Amino acid sequence: MIRLNCFFQASTLVQYAEALTAAKMLAEKSQHHEGVVAYDVFPSATRPEIFMICETWKDQESLDKHSATPEFKELVAVIQRCGTLKLESFNF
């Protein structure tokens, strides 16, 4: 399995709201993708400009198919436009 932790930091609180909306839409749409084990968005309890997306995928093929979908490309572009993303990936 593959676990992705995506840390997002917004440039402004307005951009945070836009990015969080896009992240929640992405999580909702991704719940139905083949091979998804978990896909959640977690706003920070201590820093108002930060949230984390945690994804778990059955295998690399499932993750690759997810990453190639139009909604993934569109919504990730919105998130990236609003701030900085840092990605951690783990295989287990």
Where are these regions (language model features)?
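Short S/T/G/P-rich N-terminal loop/turn motif that feeds into the first structured element of a domain
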Residues: M1-F51, T56-A68, K86-F92
